[in-house]
Curated annotation (Swiss-Prot):
Cellular localisation: Cytoplasm
Protein name: Proline--tRNA ligase
Statement: the UniProt record of this protein carries the keyword Coiled coil: no
Subunit structure comment from the entry: Homodimer.
Upper lineage: Bacteria, Bacillati, Bacillota, Bacilli, Lactobacillales
Protein keywords: Aminoacyl-tRNA synthetase, ATP-binding, Cytoplasm, Ligase, Nucleotide-binding, Protein biosynthesis
Length: 618
């Protein structure tokens, strides 16, 4: 493919509105362009990368018996009313009317559509299991689109749905999808973790998220690609390294989720779902009497602890929530933070939000900072974190502004449900007892769910079982954010290319090192002087030999300065660069492997053999 015939609008500078490096590079390197807020055009390079990823997906899904189809993106609102999600999905749902004033939506996901199709076609257990998927644009009316393809209003998604007679059968397909996802993301060259996830608005029972890990900005070895003029990182002057560190730090860390994972085992979970090892305390302490004391101007845990000369751990943090419009008290030890997702899941609530201070006064008679679990009126549900039951003679709010109670003891002074509702902390022991928890930022690239009968119940999707009884179909749901993959890959494979000029000056510039399986082309063939006939003849010979061996070749045939060509090549990020320069008359070409920065001159007749050797481990 001739570069002069492609739309690759590279930029000399980073776009000023980009905050994460993946967004900046995909715009600067000519992969995408924003059409309007949260809506992007995928230019030829991005389209080729996405199509390569689709090919990987299709190959792996063929192995597990998943069948591709295509459903409409424009959906009747009646289906979503039937499932109940038309009212509950929220403001992200695009709602519209046709000329007859009938209600429609633009699909953000397709559980209802697939459930209806199967409900109308499948009547017997003998027709199951079914494993269907599609690759399609989805729509969500994001309030604040940001970070390039990571948070958009239109996006490409692979969504799959499986239909079963039993949960045992669902488990088999769920595990097959888990293995297929691992194979897909591994082939795509991604550093990822499969983690315990939250089902959120999708509904369902079990779920697993797949997160692309955002690289550590402090590890220079993984960010820098050194030119052959620089033997090692140690040869770069300290002041230059400080400039490079500042450049790395200037970009926001991408990834909307924090992942907690074990340093020694396979345990990994979204921070919203993560837990740590809990060992109940067995110490015996004489129980003090309850005493009400004045605590003037003490609104926070640390202020109360300082006033009473105790540790924050001895103070019970009391938070008031409204769960489906009913009050719930959540209790934590003072130096812990609430995990609202865990609390919501424990309660089985559809909606959970912190109460207002006005609601606190109405329900408990006091404002924030003075709330507590003692002497409550009937009907207020109390959920305490597991660690609360280890406390003795603790301090809690007296439900009277400016006052607290000392000598508070669980089970004697209040009754509560105990559950893990706290946010874990880095360095705590992993729940499996192996290693400690470490945190990383991650980009969600895939999610699989055991939906169970969530949709078949509400939409009457039943089959006749072996005994002729009508039973609901058991479902699974499996998503991959296809357009997000481009962001995740660039985030992980962005590099700073460092070189040294003949005068001894150090230069560094951003570029991409695409993994081979997703690179839009395999080889970037650059002719330094397109007006040199010998160079042109050699270019055509090399291009033909590469293509004959199955390489996808992007040939830079533009009449541009060589520096501009090399700069664009670094930005575009193809794995191999072959340059035809001053030694074209001798048949000599230069090979450069982008991932390492290594380069070598060879005769054109030996090019294919040399590439086979240089890339055999890649």
């Amino acid at each position: 493919m001739k570069q002069s015939k492609m739309l690759i609008p590279t930029l000399r500078e980073m776009p000023s509105d980009a905050q994460v490096i993946s967004h900046a590079l995909m715009v600067r390197a000519g992969y995408v362009r924003q059409v309007s807020a949260g809506i992007y055009a995928y230019l030829p390079l991005a389209h080729r990368t996405i199509e390569k990823f689709k090919t990987i997906m299709r190959q792996e899904f063929d192995k597990i018996g998943a069948v591709e189809m295509l459903a409409p993106a424009l959906l009747t609102a009646d289906l979503w009313r039937e499932s109940g999600r038309y009212e509950t999905y929220g403001e992200d749902l695009y709602k519209l009317k046709n000329r007859d004033k009938s209600d429609f939506i633009l699909g953000p996901t397709h559980e209802e559509t697939f459930t209806t199709l199967v409900r109308d076609a499948v009547k017997s257990y003998k027709q199951l299991p079914l494993n269907l998927y599609q690759i399609q644009s989805k729509y969500r009316d994001e309030k604040r689109p940001r970070n390039g393809l990571l948070r958009t209003r239109e996006f490409i998604m692979k969504d799959g749905y499986s239909f079963h007679q039993s949960y045992d059968d669902l488990d088999v397909t769920y595990d097959a999808y888990r293995q297929a996802y691992e194979a897909i993301f591994t082939r795509a060259g991604l550093d990822f973790k499969g983690i315990i996830g939250d089902g959120g608005a999708m509904g369902g029972k079990d779920s697993q998220e797949f997160m692309a890990i955002t690289p550590d900005r402090t590890n220079l070895d993984r960010w820098l690609v050194l030119d052959k003029s620089i033997p090692s990182l140690a040869d770069i002057p300290e002041e230059v390294l400080e400039e490079i560190k500042a450049e790395l730090a200037s970009w926001l860390v991408s990834g909307e989720d924090t992942i907690a994972y074990s340093s020694e085992s396979s345990y990994a979970a979204n921070l919203e779902m993560a837990t740590s090892e809990y060992k109940p305390s067995s110490k015996v302490t004489a129980l003090d009497d309850l005493v009400e004391i004045e605590t003037p101007n003490c609104k926070t845990i640390d202020e109360v602890a300082a006033f009473l000369d105790i540790t924050e751990h001895q103070v019970i943090k009391t938070l008031l929530f409204m769960a489906d419009h009913e009050p719930v008290l959540a209790l934590l030890v003072g130096n812990d933070q609430i995990n609202a997702v865990k609390l919501k899941n424990h309660l089985g609530a559809d909606f959970l939000e912190p109460a207002s201070e006005e609601e606190a006064h109405t329900i408990l008679g006091a404002g924030f900072g003075s709330l507590g679990p003692v002497h409550l009126t009937d009907g207020i549900r109390i959920v305490a974190d597991r660690k609360i039951q280890d406390l003795a003679n603790a301090v809690a709010g007296a439900n009277k502004d400016g006052y607290h109670l000392t000598g508070v003891n669980p089970n004697r002074d209040f009754q509560a449900e105990y559950a893990d509702i706290r946010e874990v902390k880095e360095g705590e022991t992993s729940p499996d007892g192996h290693g400690v928890l470490q945190f990383a930022r991650g980009i969600e690239i895939g999610h699989i769910f055991k939906l169970g009968t969530r949709y078949s119940d509400s939409m009457a999707a039943n089959i006749l079982d072996e005994n002729g009884r009508a039973v609901p179909i058991v479902m699974g749901c499996y998503g991959i954010g296809v357009s997000r993959i481009l962001s995740a890959v660039i985030e992980q494979h962005a590099r700073l290319f460092v070189s040294k000029t003949p005068k001894g000056d150090y230069r560094y510039a951003w570029g991409i090192n695409f993994p081979k399986e997703l690179a839009p082309f395999d080889v970037h063939l650059i002719t330094v002087n397109v007006k040199d006939q010998e160079a042109q003849d050699l270019t055509e010979k090399v291009e033909a030999s590469l293509m004959a061996k199955g390489y996808d070749v992007l040939t830079d045939d533009r009449n541009e300065r060589v520096g501009s060509k090399f700069s664009d090549s670094d930005l575009i990020g193809l794995p191999i660069r072959v340059t035809i320069g001053k030694k074209a008359a001798e048949g000599i070409v230069e090979i450069k492997i982008k991932a390492t920065g290594d380069s070598i001159e060879v005769h054109a007749d030996s090019l294919i053999e040399t590439l086979d050797i240089l890339t055999k481990d890649n």
